[in-house]
Design a protein with these regions (language model features):
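Short capping micro-motif at the N-terminus of alpha-helices
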Residues: 15-17
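Short, surface-exposed, low-complexity cationic segments
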Residues: 19-39
Length: 128
């Protein structure tokens, strides 16, 4: 389990990445977390490369997926203080910037994947 705190609209919000998060996300939103993270990261990267703002807006579906992922990870980190409804959680913020929050979430997942890979390599050595 990995945790990271991010300041959002003047409030510190903790996010948690663990093996349970993809399952929680799938159960709550009926979507694949990793596929959605890749799609969102691609949209943000694409927008950053384009100069024409009109043709480079991030699709609303991607923004919604991002909010859903952030919500699941925040609720997983702090179930006592994160409301059971995503709309109630989002209402707490005046702004919720994908450019501020997404890098922290991606970093958590990259760190989580590295930890799993190292554990798998160590298991292979022990079993081998």
């Amino acid at each position: 389990m990995l945790r990271k705190k991010v300041e959002i609209d003047g409030r510190e919000v903790e996010f948690k990445a663990s093996a349970a998060v993809p399952r929680i996300y799938r159960m709550k939103f009926r979507r694949d977390l990793f596929m959605d993270l890749q799609k969102i990261a691609k949209s943000v990267k694409k927008k950053g490369k384009k100069e024409d703002k009109e043709s480079s807006e991030i699709p609303i579906e991607d923004l919604e997926m991002f909010e859903n992922i952030a919500y699941v990870m925040a609720q997983h980190a702090d179930p006592e203080n994160v409301p059971p409804d995503i709309m109630d959680w989002l209402e707490q913020f005046n702004t919720f910037s994908i450019y501020q929050i997404l890098p922290a979430i991606l970093e958590l997942w990259n760190m989580n994947e590295e930890t799993k890979s190292q554990a798998k390599k160590n298991l292979d050595r022990v079993a081998g």
